[in-house]
Amino acid sequence: MAREYKIEDYRNFGIMAHIDAGKTTMTERILFYTGKNHKIGETHDGASTMDWMEQEQERGITITSAATTTFWQGRDGKKRRFNIIDTPGHVDFTIEVERSLRVLDGAIALLDANAGVEPQTETVWRQAEKYHVPRMVFVNKMDKIGADFYRSVEMVGSRLGAVALPVQLPIGAENDFVGVVDLIEMKALTWDGTIGAPATVGEIPADMADKAEEYREKLIELAVEIDEAAMEAYLEGTMPTNDELRALIRKGTIEVKFHPILCGTAFKNRGVQPLLDAVVEFLPAPTDVPAIKGIDVKTETETTRESSDEAPLSMLAFKIMNDPFVGSLTFARIYSGKLTKGVSLENTVKGKRERIGRMLQMHSNSREDIDEAFAGDIVALAGLKETTTGDTLCDPLKPVILERMEFPDPVIEIAIEPKTKADQEKMGIALNRLAAEDPSFRVKSDEESGQTIIAGMGELHLDILVDRMKREFKVEANVGAPQVAYRESITRAAEIDYTHKKQSGGSGQFARVKIIFEPHDGDDFIFESKIVGGSVPKEYIPGVQKGIESVMGAGPLAGFPMLGVKATLIDGAYHDVDSSVLAFEIASRAAFREGAQKAGAQLLEPIMKVEVVTPEDYVGDVIGDLNSRRGQISGTEGRGIATVVNAMVPLANMFGYVNSLRSMSQGRAQYTMQFDHYEPVPTAVAQEIQKKFA
């Protein structure tokens, strides 16, 4: 079977937004207008197509990014293939967003016309910057009370530091919102609001003519800056044609120089079709973005893989899901080459072979078996044994490791135990499966108490995982109170000279190390050797590093992992017979334990960036409450009729905050929080923690 759509006609994109900006409704509309969905599912009915896990439908939030393939005929009459990845907008699931962005070529950022740029929008935007993803912005919910398109455009500049390029203006707002002015064609597009109705094209309302001219002029000025020839022509008085203008906007969007801004209301069916046209016209095909980089396994040098069916096969596994009908599904993006059912591929990260048995094309919760897939496709593979998120699968003859994804460490832990003996074994299987799906979820055993500890990115994250264990794996579990994932570090430099000697008949053990331990700004561990003259032979130096790393996981104060330590090996001694890598490992372990005490060990706690959006009446109570939680208020600002309070608060003091805020504001205030940084714990609090964990 040959390729049905040219790779130039693919658009791999995602929709990213703050929770409640209308992302799931927008995806539903896109699926409806592109003909994949016959009945629109509304999020508030719990019937949405993309949100296919039970909890998502209950909670009305999107948790897992389902990938969907659909098609759209552009303005030029040509059909394009869309692969849409739905991403969650809740802070506890930023990891999902991160991995979706990693495999997308472009994205639509949705804004709520009333709230503008919200905290999660900033987080997701920053993640997209990291991967240099071309983005458009759609100002949604223009029919909502307090909708303000121009304020949202201003916030894209002031809050996101991005260059906003409005290509449409709204006609009316709130209940009077009827359509948009297309600044490229200089026509008015209006909709009567019935599902699936095309736009009525007409003249721009007289009272908007001047504004439209002014914004079109700004649009052209920004667009011609992208291309020297267009700029020269413009300065000589030649205006670009509409098609030339679209080409310039496309070029600038793909180069991430600016972001086209459109508007509408997905719920009321106004503005969806022009957005789909804009995906075709402004967002990149896989061939428009730089070729993916990787490491050639044979030569260990950097290499690239072009988006072409002729290139050697390479693909990145970006998500693992348990499907109730198919079992474990691995979602992968094919970057180069052609994939055929039945072939064996190399997992270069694990050094294992995987056979491709069953291949599926996913529509949100229905699936279609396929035998072939090509560069640019996103496929679901059933039955892979060794592959986890972030692994590369490729042609065994041309092995490559594509750029890995980075996942943050969890900030919250809870103890969990099975309710019955029968649940014991099932719980182990369930937790391992969930951890394979979600790299930001960790499972470990507490050696002293024998308890199983699960760790994640927030209370909601762990709630949902425990809930899934119950539903999908039928495991009943008792859950402890949440614990903060504290860390330890050192505050000053300390030099330790330690000798490890053991003689008990036969060959003994001997190693002497002289190490300087000092704090550094990062969170990682840095090891350096300044040995000259062979006082410690080269082959023993890795043992010194390994020894220190093996005890970094349990600091001297309360047994928490250590952060931000630099160790420099400056001297030592060895014995021809009695020294070994193991002896140096033991010596450096003991040196570190002694050094951590002498270097002024301190406890660190995670500090969360908290944003509370509250009606004016409750601002005083909210600020007072955050102060009582050891919070530092960093400022307040107006947002529509509400006030936004920004603060930095220790995670330890934020447990159960959702209920306090609800009762304080009669359910009218909302908050978001995300991990920001680690900070030393105040002495009195640190003593309490040490007592508890010592």
Swiss-Prot record:
Keyword GTP-binding set for record: yes
Gene: fusA
Kinase as UniProt keyword: no
Function statement: Catalyzes the GTP-dependent ribosomal translocation step during translation elongation. During this step, the ribosome changes from the pre-translocational (PRE) to the post-translocational (POST) state as the newly formed A-site-bound peptidyl-tRNA and P-site-bound deacylated tRNA move to the P and E sites, respectively. Catalyzes the coordinated movement of the two tRNA molecules, the mRNA and conformational changes in the ribosome.
Transmembrane domains' residue ranges: none
GO terms for biological process, alphabetical: ribosome disassembly
Binding site for GTP: 17-24, 86-90, 140-143
PANTHER family membership: RIBOSOME-RELEASING FACTOR 2, MITOCHONDRIAL (PTHR43261:SF1), TRANSLATION ELONGATION FACTOR G-RELATED (PTHR43261)
Species name: Brucella ovis (strain ATCC 25840 / 63/290 / NCTC 10512)
Keywords for the protein's UniProt record, in alphabetical order: Cytoplasm, Elongation factor, GTP-binding, Nucleotide-binding, Protein biosynthesis
Localization annotation: Cytoplasm
Protein origin, superkingdom: Bacteria
An example molecular function term from Gene Ontology annotations: GTPase activity
Signal peptide region: none
Protein name per UniProt: Elongation factor G
Similarity annotation: Belongs to the TRAFAC class translation factor GTPase superfamily. Classic translation factor GTPase family. EF-G/EF-2 subfamily.
Main subcellular location: cytoplasm
SUPFAM superfamilies: EF-G C-terminal domain-like, P-loop containing nucleoside triphosphate hydrolases, Ribosomal protein S5 domain 2-like, Translation proteins
InterPro entries with a match to the protein in the record: EFG_II (IPR041095), EFG_III (IPR009022), EFG_III/V (IPR035647), EFG_IV (IPR047872), EFG_V (IPR035649), EFG_V-like (IPR000640), EFTu-like_2 (IPR004161), G_TR_CS (IPR031157)
GO terms under cellular component: cytoplasm
Domain tr-type G: 8-287
Phylogenetic classification of the source organism: Bacteria, Pseudomonadati, Pseudomonadota, Alphaproteobacteria, Hyphomicrobiales
